Every structure is written in structure tokens, then in C-alpha cells.
Amino acid sequence: MNKPLLWISVLTSLLEAFAHTDLSGKVFVFPRESVTDHVNLITPLEKPLQNFTLCFRAYSDLSRAYSLFSYNTQGRDNELLVYKERVGEYSLYIGRHKVTSKVIEKFPAPVHICVSWESSSGIAEFWINGTPLVKKGLRQGYFVEAQPKIVLGQEQDSYGGKFDRSQSFVGEIGDLYMWDSVLPPENILSAYQGTPLPANILDWQALNYEIRGYVIIKPLVWV
């Protein structure tokens, strides 16, 4: 292969693997269990988080535990982790500590998940399909470290790696947004209804991401 064609091939591969794009109406599909398949979400977050709200849609027929959103920093695993323990049980980890919220839900079925946390009060709250669950207290006064590695599809036990097949996600994830504030109920309901506010940490309509392994982008057909 001559040099111009080689560089075009390399550039095309980089653009495919490292993209910044509007994913409206689309999802990441994770078709299999693995220790390799994942998506890295890139954000220029330079300051520790004192508050946040994270919302996304997911669809899986797994009955075992799995990671939905894994945020690690240097030397700190489970700095921020959204984890499904089993059907009807969702956990939020902040700084390796966790709370779990329970909800009656159909299985298997698509779900819209929002979770918020506020450092000053320590209050963490899940919203499932537009309905708030019982508030819990978690790590009052703590700050979530900046410069994270954020992974979909796997649970990190190190900074960007050390994955476990038994915690991998199989299914679809889309409409993911993250803000550096606790959204009021009306804005969470707007996200559930498909009209979210512009997000300043992660925004599905302007997402910087990197696909690793067998992950496919497909149309969202289950909302």
C-alpha cells in the first residue's frame, strides 16, 4: 500500500474509533458478554463534582448483576458507578460507598434511568421511568474526583480497565446525558419524555466517544 492510501486508512480508522457526534435516535448495542467490548465516553471534566444528574435509557434481558455506567479516576475505582444488582434493584456508588433503591418493574423491558447526588446533603435519588424512588444518604460532603475514565458496557476495577465478564452489560444504551447539578423534577421528567436540557458533562446530541471491541450503533426502536 502506498503512503497516501496508508494515511487515509489510518485516519479513517481513527475517526471511526474516536468520534464526536449527534447520536439522537440511536443506541449503542452491546451484543455479547465479554471482557473487551465497551465504549469510552470522553469529557473535559477538570473540577471535582459536588453535584450531578445522570440520565439514560437501557434495554437488557440480563437477570444477573451488571454495570450500567462506570466512572473511575486515578487510584479510585467505583468513584461513581451505576450498577443493576438484579431485577428491580439499582445501586449508586460514590467513592466506593453505595446505596441501593428498589422498584417494581417489568422484565425484560426498556427503562429510563435518572440518578442524582448532592454533596452538601448527601442525598442520592433514582428516578425510574419518570417516577422518583426513595431518597438515600450517601457520602455527605464528598467530592467526586475529576479527570475520569467513563466506560459503558463494562465495570472498571482499575483506571480504564480490569474488566470482569460477569459484570459486563449485554443490551442497548442510549439518550445519555449528564449535568453538574441536581435537576429539578420537571427537568428530569422532560428527559424521560425525550426533551432533555442541554447537558454540560455528557450530551447524547454532541457525544465524544471511543468504541472498543464489538459494539454497534443502531437506531433506537423501543421508545
From Swiss-Prot:
UniProt signal peptide: 1-19
GO terms for cellular component: blood microparticle; collagen-containing extracellular matrix; extracellular exosome; extracellular region; extracellular space; nucleus
Expressing tissues: Found in serum and urine.
PANTHER family: C-REACTIVE PROTEIN-RELATED, SERUM AMYLOID P-COMPONENT
Job of this protein: Can interact with DNA and histones and may scavenge nuclear material released from damaged circulating cells. May also function as a calcium-dependent lectin.
Quaternary context: Homopentamer. Pentraxin (or pentaxin) have a discoid arrangement of 5 non-covalently bound subunits.
Protein name: Serum amyloid P-component
Native species: Homo sapiens (Human)
